[in-house]
Amino acid sequence: MDRETRALADSHFRGLGVDVPGVGQAPGRVAFVSEPGAFSYADFVRGFLLPNLPCVFSSAFTQGWGSRRRWVTPAGRPDFDHLLRTYGDVVVPVANCGVQEYNSNPKEHMTLRDYITYWKEYIQAGYSSPRGCLYLKDWHLCRDFPVEDVFTLPVYFSSDWLNEFWDALDVDDYRFVYAGPAGSWSPFHADIFRSFSWSVNVCGRKKWLLFPPGQEEALRDRHGNLPYDVTSPALCDTHLHPRNQLAGPPLEITQEAGEMVFVPSGWHHQVHNLDDTISINHNWVNGFNLANMWRFLQQELCAVQEEVSEWRDSMPDWHHHCQVIMRSCSGINFEEFYHFLKVIAEKRLLVLREAAAEDGAGLGFEQAAFDVGRITEVLASLVAHPDFQRVDTSAFSPQPKELLQQLREAVDAAAAP
């Protein structure tokens, strides 16, 4: 991040604090970025991160990736032989697209060898099977094979706090491989923690249906539930979906092989594989969508508290139990969110102390200064939140208010001429 881009981003957020503006109606079409050499990190910040809008990058951005060279046949189809030789005995998670479990699909685990055997038989049977349409989803290949030459992280997505945090703990990540036959799909959803995501088709094509933040509310049924499938004729039933006519049309994207889709924070979407497809997908959070993550966590806690409100007066340590339930349902609670902020903050404070000024998109002075500013805003809101004040922070180091003071001093120092 250069100085001019940081100034623009700081100015954008100065009036917002931890508020999250809506996007409103989807734009008429998705922007297409064709030339890597003509599109900078600053361009991405101005055009897409700040306004929280989607875009598609051309296949030129991924042409050097190892996965595109080795996982794909000359005809552009999945290279099953290579995948079997390299990963055949790896156990992978597989979803059944034909079975609805709440608003998702149930998963089973099998070896990649067994899944590819199924996939081949599915193709040979005219894309049909008594087992249904199975879709390999959420395979942590990069976590399990960290030295594999699979992809090169695009510079636009290099500020990735989620994976920076989980890499520091060395227990998990939010980098996934998806692979499935034509007709496999992912139901309507928004990404975890209201993160950004990027998705590259190593081979095959996808159809995306995207709705900007807030538009999903008009799609809820009369019970308040979001739809499982936004293409279902049931949405036309005005008795079941009384507000559906208020929903704007989705933004549609047909993503070709090699192309990269940027999905903004909080955009609900549904994705269909039009061909036999392999994709690489990352979820990521940084200073540009941190407030969205924080608002989402507050909403999740409120939902938990409402669900168990009848035990509020009778259950000892009710607030603590709500945090436990929240972590079980959402993958994180207020305590872990503080540790997430702390890990990123301490790394950025170190950069600022070393005054490692540099241009570009790397973790230099300007990027660290912007990050510290955003963490300060959100941490101040977290520290002031009544439910965080009930969390036992006696073992935290540093104490939340101490870290907040360090950050405020760093913000003042970074702003000094």
Swiss-Prot record:
Q: What is the effect of changing H189A?
A: Loss of interaction with ETF1 and its ability to hydroxylate ETF1
List GO terms (cellular component aspect).
cytoplasm; cytosol; nucleus
Pfam families hit by this protein: JmjC
Task: Please identify the protein, giving its name as recorded.
Answer: 2-oxoglutarate and iron-dependent oxygenase JMJD4
As recorded in Swiss-Prot or TrEMBL, the protein's gene is named: JMJD4
Q: How does it assemble?
A: Interacts with ETF1. Interacts with the ETF1-GSPT1 complex.
The EC code for this enzyme is 1.14.11.-
Where the record annotates domain JmjC, the positions are 142-301
Q: For this protein, what reaction is catalysed?
A: L-lysyl-[protein] + 2-oxoglutarate + O2 = 4-hydroxy-L-lysyl-[protein] + succinate + CO2
